[in-house]
């Protein structure tokens, strides 16, 4: 197999022998003197190769081993994903150790990229990007689309069986989804997918994606620019510019992105309500939306030394002008299957916003053996939606409904994590505090819907610890998180004892990872929570049409999730099994108005228990220029509800296939295809009634040593991604058949000059709270 010549790693060691123990400290770097993070360094007995102790390098490439006083003669074994394992005797003959990459170059032959390598590392499934075909994919989003277990797009991704994922770049939590698009695939070292995050993560975080980039050196000015145009039914565009200045330990960055998104949404909806009479609403919706966004990012980072760095970042997101929606509805209303009324309605909606603002700062340092990581964040945003609906009824009075809804959010958060070696492992302890203020109001001039205004003031104080240690049989990680949440609810400015809540919860986590011959195994357990969003908790009753309302439920309880996952990796195959038991699961439900049985209000409620099993199998070989990746997955739940006086089973599984293909041709030509098929089935209390299929195709050509690239492609060629679904409740059923302009032909141009990875190391504080806004 054609392989790259070794990426060399140099290891500098020094040891001090004390009366009680011996300490070995060193750094691992590549041939450019850039540190290699997460390399494993273990000390083994010369007599029987039994484990004495071990360590993992930090982000500076540093490791520290402490040998017991009575330990026999030992040798070191150094390994890392993408590198050949080496055994090293002590003392070293020299201060440099060369580790060969698993992708070796052969003299006199043309080298082609290798398939992305997958392996289990500690709590994560790791896909190596550098040196693989994915390094030429384009942007960070183009890479994540090919990572096993991930679904989603444009900076918003979920892990199969675990839900929405929080994304980190170089240990910094991202708050701007466009950062993924701004990231060049050639700068990504590897991607980690964590299916059971530990105690250091917020208790609401059920999955994590960690992206590590290749460390680059060099001072000066750099920039990258990208422009994309999309067309089929409408014209859309996305443009961005990022600038960098680096000198010594200082880095200044500034970036801007502009997006114009024009869409249409055609729906056929049938609502059936079985009250004293059977009420049926059948409507056809035709809507057009125009959305524009512009965001700006400014950051500064300074490294005083390898052990101390600080930074700050400011981000603002603007709605340029106003975002507009123009849906039209044609509705037939039936009572006991006989025509009751016909209504033609038109809605004009406009959304305006005060620019969202967020400011974050961090300090990352090391004092002796103590690692310090401190972050603080502030956020403010406010949005107002104005809506006017005009209804013309064939048999009853015409109606005009004017409404205004406002949401305002602000929060402040801090997070401190301290780490120190302990008993041959590493102990981390920390504290995270979040202070949130959420205000929402809804007014209706005609008085058809009651005006409402509510405020929620919430404080979350969390303490946690994590301990990890390499044992003779594998890596063990254990953690415990405690959260005290105090939520004060105000209705029309008056404190509500009934709706205010206090929670005290413990969230344990445990992960064990090992390797048996060539098979990697990871078994983990975690307890998490899913708190209702502020919109779900609100008392606002929003007018949808004269027969349908939508509202929150301030009595909702947080859901508790218990998850067990198994990950296994061998050669080109990866198998993942997730079992999640959710208590107090939050789902849609409905209520009938007391006076008019034909008026339905959609709300939310808690369900006692929802067990879900998810299985996935990935195969990712490489055959010449072709790198296929086939993923098979299945999701099965065991769930039923009381519907129309009897049990209604909602346990039909969902099956799926994801087939990615990359063709890496000569002269920097890359072609990609992506096919995703999802079967009919049921998730929660919603049934998917149509098999969906999405087929994407693209061709990329790079010029000027990959500084300039052009990509041409088509998304959803057959326009088959729109869902057809049915929502079931006790006496209510709604069937929605949706069509929208997911099919797009596009062209993207990128140019980058002297770009390098950001020095910004902040990880963010209270970020999961922002998702509830």
Q: Which residues does each predicted region cover?
A:
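Face-selective signature of the C-terminal outer-membrane beta-barrel domain
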Residues: 295-320, 343-492, 515-520, 574-576, ...
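Short, acidic Ser/Thr/Gly-rich low-complexity loop/linker segments typical of extracellular
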Residues: 47-62
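Outer-membrane beta-barrel translocator/receptor signature
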Residues: 202-209, 217-267, 291-294
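Short, acidic, small-residue-rich periplasmic hinge/interaction motif at the N-terminus
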Residues: 42-44, 77-83, 93-133, 152-154, ...
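Outer-membrane beta-barrel signature, preferentially recognizing the C-terminal barrel domain
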Residues: 455-458, 498-501, 529-583, 600-613, ...
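N-terminal periplasmic accessory domains that precede
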Residues: 95-100, 108, 140-143, 177-178, ...
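Short acidic/polar hinge/loop motifs at secondary-structure boundaries
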Residues: 146, 172-198
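Surface-exposed extracellular loop regions of Gram-negative outer-membrane beta-barrel proteins
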Residues: 212-227, 266, 270, 282, ...
């Amino acid at each position: 197999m054609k392989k790259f010549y070794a990426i060399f790693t140099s290891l500098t060691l020094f040891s001090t022998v004390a009366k009680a123990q011996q300490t070995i400290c060193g750094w691992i770097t590549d041939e450019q003197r850039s540190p290699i993070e997460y390399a494993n360094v273990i000390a083994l007995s010369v007599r029987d190769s039994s484990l004495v102790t071990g360590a993992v390098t930090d982000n500076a490439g540093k490791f520290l081993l402490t040998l017991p006083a009575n330990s026999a003669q030992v040798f070191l074994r150094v390994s890392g994903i993408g590198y050949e394992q080496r055994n090293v005797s002590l003392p070293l003959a020299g201060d440099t150790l060369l580790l060969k990459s698993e992708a070796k170059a052969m003299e006199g032959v043309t080298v082609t990229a290798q398939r992305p390598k997958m392996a289990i590392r500690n709590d994560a499934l790791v896909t190596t990007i550098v040196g693989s075909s994915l390094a030429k994919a384009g942007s960070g989003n183009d890479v994540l689309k090919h990572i096993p277990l991930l679904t989603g797009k444009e900076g918003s991704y979920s892990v199969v069986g675990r839900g929405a994922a929080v994304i980190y770049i170089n240990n910094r939590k991202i708050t701007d989804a466009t950062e993924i698009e701004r990231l060049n695939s050639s700068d990504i070292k590897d991607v980690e997918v964590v299916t059971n995050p530990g105690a250091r993560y917020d208790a609401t975080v059920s999955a994590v994606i960690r992206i590590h980039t290749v460390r680059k050196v060099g001072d000066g000015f750099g920039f990258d620019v990208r422009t994309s145009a999309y067309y089929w039914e409408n014209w859309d565009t996305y443009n961005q510019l990022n600038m960098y200045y680096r000198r010594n330990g200082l880095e200044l960055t500034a970036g801007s992105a502009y997006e114009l998104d024009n869409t249409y949404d055609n729906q056929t909806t049938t609502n059936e309500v079985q009250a004293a009479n059977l009420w049926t609403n059948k409507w056809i919706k035709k809507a057009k939306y125009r959305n524009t966004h512009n965001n700006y990012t400014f950051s500064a980072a300074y490294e005083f030394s390898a052990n101390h760095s600080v930074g700050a970042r400011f981000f603002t997101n603007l709605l340029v002008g106003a975002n507009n929606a123009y849906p039209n509805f044609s509705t037939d209303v039936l009572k006991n299957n006989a025509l009751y009324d016909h209504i033609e309605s038109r809605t004009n909606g406009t959304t305006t916003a005060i620019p969202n603002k967020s400011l974050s700062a961090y300090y990352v340092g090391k004092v002796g053996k103590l690692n310090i990581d401190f972050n603080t964040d502030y956020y403010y945003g406010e949005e107002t939606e104005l809506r006017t609906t005009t209804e013309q009824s064939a048999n009853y009075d015409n109606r005009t409904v004017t409404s205004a809804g406002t949401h305002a959010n602000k929060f402040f958060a801090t997070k401190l994590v301290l780490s120190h070696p302990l008993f041959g492992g590493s102990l981390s302890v920390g504290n995270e505090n979040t202070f949130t203020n959420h205000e929402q109001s809804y007014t209706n001039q005609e008085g058809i819907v009651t005006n409402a205004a509510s405020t929620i003031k919430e404080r979350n104080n969390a303490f946690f610890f994590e301990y990890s240690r390499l044992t003779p049989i594998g890596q063990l990680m254990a953690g415990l998180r405690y959260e005290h949440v105090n939520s004060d609810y105000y209705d029309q400015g008056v404190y509500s004892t009934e709706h205010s809540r206090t929670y005290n919860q413990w969230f344990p986590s445990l992960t064990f990872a090992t390797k048996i011959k060539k098979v990697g195994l990871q078994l983990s357990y975690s307890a998490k929570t899913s708190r209702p969003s502020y919109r779900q908790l609100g008392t606002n009753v929003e007018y949808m049409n004269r027969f349908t309302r939508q509202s929150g439920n301030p009595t909702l309880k947080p859901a508790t999730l218990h998850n067990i996952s198994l990950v296994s990796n061998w050669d080109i195959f990866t198998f993942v099994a997730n079992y999640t038991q959710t208590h107090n699961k939050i789902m849609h439900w409905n209520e009938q108005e007391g006076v008019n049985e034909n008026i339905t209000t959609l709300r939310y409620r808690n369900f006692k228990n929802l067990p879900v099993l998810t299985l996935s199998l990935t195969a990712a070989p490489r055959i010449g220029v072709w790198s296929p990746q086939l993923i098979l997955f299945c999701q099965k739940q065991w769930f039923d509800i009381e519907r129309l006086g009897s049990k209604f089973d909602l346990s039909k599984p969902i099956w799926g296939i994801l087939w990615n293909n990359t063709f890496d041709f000569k002269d920097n030509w890359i072609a990609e295809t992506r096919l995703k098929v999802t079967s009919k089935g049921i998730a929660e209390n919603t049934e998917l009634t149509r098999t969906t299929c999405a087929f994407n195709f693209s061709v990329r050509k790079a010029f000027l040593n990959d500084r300039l690239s052009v990509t041409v492609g088509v998304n959803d060629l057959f326009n088959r991604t729109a869902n057809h679904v049915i929502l079931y409740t006790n006496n209510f059923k709604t069937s929605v058949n949706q069509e929208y302009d997911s099919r797009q032909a596009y062209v993207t141009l990128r140019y980058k000059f002297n770009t390098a990875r950001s020095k910004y190391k902040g990880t963010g504080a209270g970020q999961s709270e922002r998702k509830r806004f």
